[in-house]
């Protein structure tokens, strides 16, 4: 049997179950990787690796288009989106497509168009992926030197980084254009229960935008997740887009400084580990955003946040009992604290009962009833609107609690409905994926550093027990 290792190897060698599966330049003997090691076989075949990446993009866009059309086909306009297990249509509605006052869906045609556009795009990407995987040149360096690269070429790598940053910057400006010029976006804080509006005055003050980055991530601070108005959201996209574009130009025009050349490992697997770390961070941030934030993820589409559902319950029963003659300002609960209203540690009037721990919740249906010192007793008596009652009653019964078998609500609730909040699905999935990507980062970073240090040489195959065994095939 041919020896499949050398002392200078920096990758593990796997043994094929069936030695007959072989493709030139992609078999185990020439690459050191078995078929199931995927793109590792293509590390030095830039043309084939391009095919794998383009095909992967095609799969992603195909999922988006197919799932989009699936949600459109199943959508019932009479029910809220969050009752229907939808995760893509809420994003489109948040961008202001097909939605009217109060978050009511008035037109599903834009959603259909979005799905079809993604399907068509996926066909183009799929064709490109298959072409480059099977027909196009194995390596790009000879025929198309602009697209060719060597992993160790630090200058070329930072040029590629710069191109990616410019593309990301352009992407960050797309929601800005939508909000400013193309019909606006959905604002859950618009008076009367939310509406689509153009953002005419985005926040460009750097102290306001970068102030979010300097806030604590804990408690009432909430880092960037605490953003509560669309002016700051769109202004943040302007800043991020600009930074990405200028940073991209910088990386294209410059070579890495000496400290950067020393600090980083310059290999394909190292770049993979850096990317996985970034994606892991994105996943954790997205998890917190969709769980806590009801401005970027409006409750009309995603369902209430946990604190919002809890406060909605207190509000709903305050409204009911006030109608029945209860004095909500002075009634005491079983603990001697206020039954409906009490004071927060800093003196504001807040809802009493178990929901006191969520006293700092801000929600569009509740804010009109506040005064300078928290909830305003006279507003609670005279100013509650029917839409506020309807919305809080709806949110009260749709808390983002739920088990895998889709029995939603509090575990002890006898009238539980078949409901799990999209907030639960999206935050849980992004947390789990963020964690797995972090583990992948550690794995690939460790291997890349070991390879760079020259001490990952693999198992010495001369003493490998499997060599004395009968081949499986």
Swiss-Prot record:
Residues 1-14 form a propeptide. The modification Phosphothreonine is found at residue 15. [CaMn4O5] cluster binds at residue 367. It comes from the Eukaryota. The keyword Thylakoid applies. It is a multi-pass membrane protein. Its main location: plastid. GO terms for cellular component: chloroplast thylakoid membrane; photosystem II. Gene3D superfamilies: photosystem ii from thermosynechococcus elongatus (1.10.10.670). Keywords: Acetylation, Chlorophyll, Chloroplast, Chromophore, Manganese, Membrane, Metal-binding, Phosphoprotein, Photosynthesis, Photosystem II, Plastid, Thylakoid, Transmembrane, Transmembrane helix. It is found in: Plastid, Chloroplast thylakoid membrane. Disulfide bonds: none annotated. Belongs to the PsbB/PsbC family. PsbC subfamily. NCBIfam families: psbC. This is Photosystem II CP43 reaction center protein. It comes from Pinus koraiensis.
